[in-house]
From Swiss-Prot:
GO molecular function terms attached to this record: acyltransferase activity, transferring groups other than amino-acyl groups
EC number(s) reported in the record: 2.3.1.-
Entry protein name: Uncharacterized N-acetyltransferase YkwB
CDD domains, alphabetized: NAT_SF
Keywords for the protein's UniProt record, in alphabetical order: Acyltransferase, Transferase
Record domain N-acetyltransferase: where: 18-219
Organism per entry: Bacillus subtilis (strain 168)
Length: 226
């Protein structure tokens, strides 16, 4: 177990000690409980992490397996793998990018840190936990000398407007401040930039199966010279 960050966050009344570290096999049961808390129906329950998937994350790329704790309780997690991303052929599904969530397709010599998921307990979502997890992944992107961090974001309020506007227009409306989306708005505040709306990205009724590919470019990245 490697501790990556220790700091204090404010809950509106008092400061709480936050720890961010890599998760291990002993955390698996608590991580599954966190997923159930964060993604209730109508989110497909078969997409929640299984013991085998979490064990694969730890075995395949432990540096990309993060959890956040307050008072010894896991209240957030984030998982990533390294892939080879080609901007000229950006379309893909979540299942393709993550090997159905197992991350067994992790490419140590790839160019992109790909976010598999991020989750924070609803009781702790105003403490900036998600942003600190994301910042830790940005640091990993720089440390690994990767070109970017990338991942597909849900748009869980799109279903309310799908009869009126396209998914692309919905994203534009959120960016222009005409609408607010809990996931897309959060990712934008974390410094991510949308690059493409992808259909059939993930089975997700609320998002009508759309995903928004959003990246964070590593300004320190230098392409190796021949």
């Amino acid at each position: 177990m490697i501790i990556l960050k220790q700091m204090y966050v404010h809950d509106g009344r008092k400061f709480e000690a936050l720890t961010i570290r890599n998760y291990t096999e002993t955390d698996i049961e608590r991580l599954i409980s966190l997923q159930e808390e964060c993604f209730p129906p109508p989110f497909p329950q078969e997409l929640l992490w299984s013991e085998d998937q979490l064990a694969s994350h730890i075995k395949t790329f432990p540096e990309g397996a993060l959890c956040a704790l307050i008072n010894g309780r896991i209240i957030g997690s984030m998982t990533a793998l390294i892939v080879q991303f080609e901007p000229d052929s950006p379309d893909h599904t979540w299942a393709q990018a993550t090997d159905n969530g197992s991350i067994k397709n992790h490419e140590p010599h790839g160019n992109t840190l790909y976010v598999v998921d991020i989750s924070v307990s609803p009781h702790y979502r105003k403490l900036g936990i998600g942003k600190w997890l994301m910042n830790t992944m940005y640091e990993l992107t720089v440390d690994k000398r990767l070109e970017r961090l990338l991942g597909g974001g849900r748009i869980p309020l799109y279903y309310k407007y799908a009869h009126e506007i396209s998914a692309v227009q919905y994203v534009e409306d959120v960016m222009e401040g005409r609408k607010n989306d809990p996931v897309l708005s959060f990712l934008l505040r974390c410094g991510r930039s949308p690059i493409r709306v992808v259909s059939n990205y993930l089975e997700d009724k609320e998002s009508l199966n759309y995903g928004v590919l959003m990246e964070w470019k590593n300004v320190f990245y230098k392409k190796a010279s021949c």
